[in-house]
Amino acid sequence: MLTRFQLKDVAGLFSEGVEPEPQLAPAARRRRRLETLRESVPAGVRRFAMVAFNLLGRRELATLPATLDLMIRDRFIRSNVLPDPRAALAGEEGLAGLAPDLSPATMMEAYGVGLNPSASLGPVAWHSPPIRRVSTPGKLAQSPALRVEGPAKTFRATFDRDADSILAASANRGDCASLTPERLINAFAELFDAGYAHSFEVRDAGGRLVGGGYGVAVGRVFVLERIFSRRPGAAQVGLQRLAQCLRDWDFALVECGAGAFDLCGEAFDDVSRDFYLASLGEHLRGDRIGRWPSEGAKRNPPGARQPRAA
C-alpha cells in the first residue's frame, strides 16, 4: 500500500547524508509550483496540434476507430478500476483505458501492474505498449550510447534538487514525445512529494541547468518517464549517473518510457509486454520511499525500505 506523506513530513524521509533543501512555507511552495508547472496557452495549442498529428499519423490510423471507441466508452463509464495491461489495443501506443484518477495511490497501483500514464492521444490515459524498452542498471551504465565526450565531461548530475523545474522543462520540449498536460505534470509532482518519483538535474560548470529528467521507482524497477537536453551530452551524463546509482542501490531493471526514448532509446533493449510484466512482478517488493541523496552516494540505499503487500 502506498504511504501518503504531507509536505511538512518530507524532511523526515531523507536518507542519512541527504542535504535538505531550504524549506518554503506550504503556501509559498504551492504558489511557486503553480507558476512553474502552469501550461501556457501557446504550449496548450501546440500540444493539441501534436495530438491531432499523432492520431491521424500513418502509424496509428489503422487503430483510430478502436481508439475512439474505447475513449468514448471509458468517458461515459468512468470506472475507477484499472484496465488489464494485457488487453490493451493493438498498435504502438498500447492504449488500455482512460485515467480519470491520478492520485498517488492509483498511479503507483498502475505502475505496479505495468500501466504507464500518457496523453499522447489527447486525454490522460493508461498505456501498455506491446514492446517495452528495458535494461539492467549495470548494463545501462556501461552502454556505449551514453559515452560522454567534449564539454559534457564537466557537467554534474544531482538528484531530487529541483523537481518542479525538471517537470516543467521536460513537458515543454515541443515534440510528440513530451505531450504532458498540466494535470499529468501535477500528478508527477505529487508522486515526488510522496517519495516515489525522482528527478535528476544536469548542470554545467557555471551551475546552469542543461538537462535532466524524471521517473518513478516501483519496487526495484525504475520507470524513466521523461528526459531533456539543452546541451549536447547532457542527457547522457544524467542517465549514466542515474544508472550507476540504481546499480549501487540494488535496482533490478530500468524501463525507458516513450517520453525518453528519442534521446536515449539506443541504450535499451526491446522486450515483449509479457516479458516486462513478468520481470516487473518479480521485483515489486522493497519500495524505498523518500528523497535520494543529491550526489547519489554509493552503497547507501535511499529512503526507508518498505515491503509491498502480496
Task: Label each residue range with its predicted role.
Residues 1-310:
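N-acyltransferase acceptor-side catalytic subdomain
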